[in-house]
Design a protein with these regions (language model features):
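Glycine-rich phosphate-binding loop used to anchor ATP phosphates in small-molecule kinases
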Residues: 54-103
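Conserved substrate/cofactor phosphate-moiety recognition/catalytic segment
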Residues: 16-75, 114-118
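Glycine-rich loops and low-complexity Gly/Arg-rich segments
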Residues: 30-31, 53-55, 102-105, 129-132
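Short N-terminal micro-motifs specific to bacterial/archaeal maturation
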Residues: 1, 25, 50, 54, ...
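Conserved GTP-binding G-domain of TRAFAC-class P-loop NTPases and closely related GTPase folds
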Residues: 1-8, 13-17, 21, 25-27, ...
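Charged, low-complexity, helix/coiled-coil-prone segments
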Residues: 1-13, 31-38, 78-85
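ATP-dependent NMP and nucleoside kinases share a basic, alpha-helical "lid"
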Residues: 37, 41-42, 83-126, 140
Length: 157
């Protein structure tokens, strides 16, 4: 069976940790890892290093090119990204229909925001995001639903 597994949740919520704990790293495409391939961490206004968001078109173009190549071969693929917008997830649905894939989404949006903020502080400095970014992401999750046709899973299932 052809399977595309999407992670969904705010930065720092545990998506990448889930992938590591379940030995899925070799199957994962990570937007953050592609960002780091496109540009080294940059100095932020707070004097720490962070992952640049300046190359988003290139990052997502590369991610979808690699995803399509893997789907053409029928490979199992995990997407490590926030997947906070319904329209983004619909793009995966379109590809899944083309390549006859089943889509599952491990949804971390039930993790309390305060826990996510706490976890964010335990990340390496360059991977931490401002608290406002986490708050904005949680507000978006409240209005953006997982599309029909994508099976929602909880991290503990």
């Amino acid at each position: 069976m052809r399977v595309l597994l999407l992670m969904r949740g705010a930065p720092g919520v545990g998506k990448t940790t889930f992938i590591k704990e379940n030995n899925l790293e070799q199957f994962a495409l990570s937007a953050d890892e592609i960002r780091l391939l496109c540009q080294s961490p940059v100095m932020t206004t707070s004097g720490t290093f962070g992952i640049s968001q300046d190359n988003e078109k290139k990052v997502w173009s590369l991610l979808f090119q690699i995803l399509e190549a893997r789907m053409q071969r029928g490979e199992f693929v995990v997407i490590d990204a926030t997947n906070s917008k319904t329209v983004e997830m619909n793009r995966y649905k379109t590809m899944a229909q083309t390549y006859r894939y089943h889509i599952y989404c491990v949804d971390f949006t039930d993790v309390p925001m305060e826990e996510c903020k706490r976890r964010n502080l335990t990340r390496p400095d360059y991977k931490q995001v401002p608290e406002e970014a986490i708050e904005k992401m949680y507000a978006r999750f409240a209005t953006q639903q997982i599309p029909t046709g994508i099976v929602k899973l909880r991290p503990d299932e």
